[in-house]
């Protein structure tokens, strides 16, 4: 046996690790063994602290039963485990439970002593004997208490009523932001861009081609403290407009006689207009937006006028300096169109108050400029071809009628030439200036010359380029007899058309002197026509009549007119010559029998020659009695008329 070699035997230790998983290839995955701390924690988790602890005698039995039940279950499964005779953690559990109970009791006692909500540690004091009180004093105290209680109830009720009234008033004054935004949408175009609400002030939807965006922003008004009393004009909504549209603006149109120096062309005489007052019930944002939109429209008008002033070629070029356009419609006359924009800052208000000069501003032309720019917007919209039926021929109606109703070259050229905004306003300014000059000329003649009287009746139905006035020349007291001079003045852009009663038409230029000379000549002719009408009424005979006398001194203004009338029996004759400058000259011719200073000769022997009238004698017209020329002529004719 000694010579037999030793045989190596492989001894494999028993697997102390539990198998977690066996793979398909036969490999086993083991669980790591628990450490001492993990094993202690696993055992502590098996302790039931909620189970009440009994007597010491019962505890081993109960613990034995608790440990016996799992051991029996393990025996049934075929597993053999170590089972101690007594539970090792039983004393630990009991001590922990008793310590927890004592700590809870200590915490309750400390909290009660500290807070004194349920128990106070005060010594017991004997109650003092009740003092003896007077019954009347007790009755007074009870009445005071009852009155105080009633007063307190009344005060609480009054305070509650006042609070309810104040809350109702605040609820009426305080408007909701959404309802105010709905009102804003009813008047202005709004859109949502991100978290902002933007609106549109421009006239692009009406046909405007102005490049300004005209956008405003709707914001919430947070400048007021809701805890305090809300003012009457409080609005939860506010609008924020661009800085260049703040304040107020207007287009100033003025006509001046003398052109200023070239260095003063850029200065504009501003006068501060009062801000438009909001109507009762109108929110403040409505007035603010309307003012900003007016500023935008004024800027568009001035930009259009400036562009046309540079493009139009005229004999006298238009001048554009800063915010002012200078034009000369007539020689020695200047038309100024200015954009006046005053912001809300104090400097602009101070400068505007220092330069107040509203006298030269023509509000009519400013209003016409707004109308003209709106007409341009309307034409821009109308130029777009609107939807039409598919069966109808495509194109404009004028083009469809070009075959049967064709236009000639002049009509087509007239349709293609469109006047600009500046040309139209210059023509209107010319007409307004010519109309004012005509009215001033007529008024000056009426105030300067009392006999004959001149009356002007202006027509209410006028055009922007034409007006009419009816001029009557009469004598006081003889309006029914003297109706021969009736003139119709049609005032145009650059000339005045005068229509006489008999249909004759005379064209006058824009010069004031021409109109004045014409009216003076007509007033001179009126006196002669009045003598003619008076002679017919008095029974006198008209021997000669002429509106333009070729004899005598030459008048620098028009021509003199003359008339000769004879008495009913032919004994007397009156000759009247009236000129615009020389005035009236009246001469009377008497019979030869009444002329004592005639030389006697032997040539005329027959008495029939004595019936001829003698030479004319001039009447000292200044010494005649009467309020006017026609009345003096009536007295003279009455004196020379035989009974």
UniProtKB/Swiss-Prot annotation:
Pfam families to which the protein is assigned, alphabetical: Med17 (PF10156)
Name of the protein described by the UniProt record: Mediator of RNA polymerase II transcription subunit 17
Any one of the GO CC terms: core mediator complex
Major place of residence: nucleus
Gene field: MED17
Keywords (A to Z) from UniProt: Activator, Nucleus, Transcription, Transcription regulation
Region (Disordered): 50-75
Family: Belongs to the Mediator complex subunit 17 family.
Compartments reported by the entry: Nucleus
Superkingdom of the source species: Eukaryota
Native organism taxonomy: Eukaryota, Metazoa, Chordata, Craniata, Vertebrata
Keyword Transcription: yes
Example of a GO MF term: transcription coregulator activity
GO biological process: DNA-templated transcription; positive regulation of DNA-templated transcription; positive regulation of transcription by RNA polymerase II; positive regulation of transcription initiation by RNA polymerase II; regulation of transcription by RNA polymerase II
Stretches that traverse the bilayer: none
